[in-house]
Structure formats: structure tokens, C-alpha cells
Amino acid sequence: MAKKNVVAMLLAGGEGKRLGALTKHTAKPAVAFGGKYRIIDFPLSNCTNSGIDTVGVLTQYEPLELNRYLGIGSAWDLDRRNGGLTILPPYQAQNGKNWYEGTANAIYRNMSYINQYDPDYVLVLSGDHIYKMDYEKMIEEHRQGGADVTISVREVPWEEAPRFGILNTDEDLRINEFEEKPENPKSNLASMGIYVFNWDVLKRHLIQDAGDAESSFDFGKNIIPNMLYENLNIRAYKFKGYWKDVGTIQSLWEANMDLLEADPEFDLYEPSWKVHSVNPNQQPQYIGNNASIETSIINEGCHIEGEINHSVLFYGVDVAEGSLVKDSVIFPNVKIGKDVTIHRAILADGVVVEDGATIGTPNGEVFVIEANSVIPKNEVVKEAIQ
């Protein structure tokens, strides 16, 4: 294989328990987002737009749908003879272990994949965040700063800080303290789960970590703290753009609603930074004579006869006459009958809502209806169907 300056490793095996029914039968990175996309489209598109053409995607939990979606990477221009996109599922190791035991272990068990390209840098990414980033700028700052490791960071609300790896830096952005998901955080500067490593440094630490019986084999809990203990040059790269961890029902719904702002912070329509996805090859959408649509995203193949207000509809959605869909996210191939009312809900793929049913309330919690559920005629859904 020809040498590659950068190899990206995309961690896409997450179960996503906090997404409930949405990840019951599929990996979190394959969850639908934004009327057209899957969550994994965003880091993959970032790689393409950043000129990174060698990406290993590490899958594990419920990988069938994700693997089928990724294919050979052609949607992201990653179908290459040298490099491109490679799916890296767990395999039976010599010690008899099958599953990846942590984020660091997943990379460790695929060192041979990385070694064949003899890279200078390894970019480690998470497959479950919504954002646009030019990774090349981060890599260049890493290179110019003489860093061993660079971690992309941003400030988060204090109440959310315990969900993240939290760090402190000096005035030159050198990281001097890192704590994974602290109960009482000292800072609100959070790791985004995006790392640039010098490959020789990372390789050495992965091998050391694999031999530690007490390790959790995790970047945040083990690798980064061990590197800090060795006083390596670990630097922060401050990211100021939109970034959303969509690991909960509420945050996923909010991120979809963010797209509907008059001047959205996260703009899907930016021509200079396209988000690539697999084309569903649907027919054009049809808007009926009595339909009403306001501040919404409507994808291909939709047939709308009712009222859509401040909502995101994926491809192949039917909404019959007299129905209202408001402040909701409707996944592909959902069929909504006549005189249905839906407020603040996420309906997963293939849901059928029969005539006269009511789902959700204008001011309540966000409801989730599991894929392929059938909501009977005139049913009033007061609890999420998961």
C-alpha cells in the first residue's frame, strides 16, 4: 500500500442505549437525521471535505443496517483502490476474544490496518455527533505546535459537563488535566471525542494499554491520562462551530429542530461544505391541494395532503388529509392516516398511524414510536411506544 499521511479511524460501534427504541435494532451512527441523512454522514463528509481519503470504520453493535448503508463508500467518494473506506468489524483474536472491549482496544486490534499505510498521523473520530469540521486545519495546528496529541474541545453548558471528558489547559492551550465524565467537573471545556495522534506515540501507548489487566481500554479513561502522566505534549484545538452530541432522545430532537431556525447555526445548504449521503432514489414529493406546509424539511417521495408545521420528514412519508404534524421528526416510510394529530414526537421507520390517532402533546416530553409499530384507529398515545 502507498503511504498515507493521515489515516482516520471512525468509531461507529456504539449501542446508544439512551436513544431507546431508535437503536433497538441498529447502531447509533445509522440513526436517521435531518430529513435525508444518517448520523455517520457528518464525520464521513468531514473527512471527504478535508481531503482525507483513507477511513477505517469500526463497527460492532447491530451492524447490518450500517454496513449496508456504507457499502464501498461511494456516496462519500471513498471507493478507492488505495485507501478509501474500509469496514472493520470485530473478529476473533488469538486470545479468543471477539468483541472490542473499549475505544482504545478497537484501535489496537486494527493496528495492522493502520500500519499498512505507514501514516504520520492517526485521526480518531466518533460516529455519533452532528457537526462540520475541516480536520486538515486541526492536523496543521497539531503539526505546527509540535504536539504528540491534539484533542478538539469546546465549551458546554455546566449542567451537561458530567456527560463528557472534561479538561483544563494553560494559556498556550497545553492540556494539564483530563477527567472522563466527572461527577463534579472543575471546568466546562469538553472533549469532542476527536483526536489527532502521532502514530508512533499512539501505537506505543496502545500496546502498553493492551497489556494492562486493570485497564478499561478507553481513550478518555486510560490512554489520555497515561499520556498526561508521561508529560507528553497534549494540546487543545478549540472548535467554535455547531456541534451536537445526539446521544439522547431530547438532544436528537433538538438538533433536528435547530435545522428549522430562520438563520440556523448548522446550515445543511452550505454549498462549500456539502454533506454527502446515500441517495434513496425516490420519486418527487407530492403536495396536495389542501395541504399546508410551514417551516419544514420535506424529502423526496413524500405525499402530503395534511398540515406540516415545524417538522422534519424523511423520504417516503404519507400524511393524509385532515392530519397535523407539528414539532416532530418523521423517519422514512411512515404512513399517517386521516385526522391524526402528532406533536413533539419522533416516529421511527415504517410506523403506521391509523385514522384519528393522537400522539404526543404540544408542551410535553418528546415521544418516540418504535420502528414498524402500528397505532390503532382513534388511539391516544400518552406514553412512548418502545
Curated annotation (Swiss-Prot):
GO terms for molecular function: ATP binding; glucose-1-phosphate adenylyltransferase activity. Its EC number is 2.7.7.27. The keyword Protein biosynthesis does not apply. It catalyses: alpha-D-glucose 1-phosphate + ATP + H(+) = ADP-alpha-D-glucose + diphosphate. Alpha-D-glucose 1-phosphate binds at Y100, G165, E180, K181, S191. Keywords: ATP-binding, Carbohydrate metabolism, Glycogen biosynthesis, Glycogen metabolism, Nucleotide-binding, Nucleotidyltransferase, Transferase. Gene3D superfamilies: Hexapeptide repeat proteins (2.160.10.10), Spore Coat Polysaccharide Biosynthesis Protein SpsA, Chain A (3.90.550.10). Coiled coil: none annotated. Pathway: Glycan biosynthesis; glycogen biosynthesis. The keyword Nucleotidyltransferase applies. GO terms for biological process: glycogen biosynthetic process. Involved in the biosynthesis of ADP-glucose, a building block required for the elongation reactions to produce glycogen. Catalyzes the reaction between ATP and alpha-D-glucose 1-phosphate (G1P) to produce pyrophosphate and ADP-Glc. Belongs to the bacterial/plant glucose-1-phosphate adenylyltransferase family. Homotetramer. This is Glucose-1-phosphate adenylyltransferase. It comes from Exiguobacterium sibiricum (strain DSM 17290 / CCUG 55495 / CIP 109462 / JCM 13490 / 255-15). The gene is glgC.
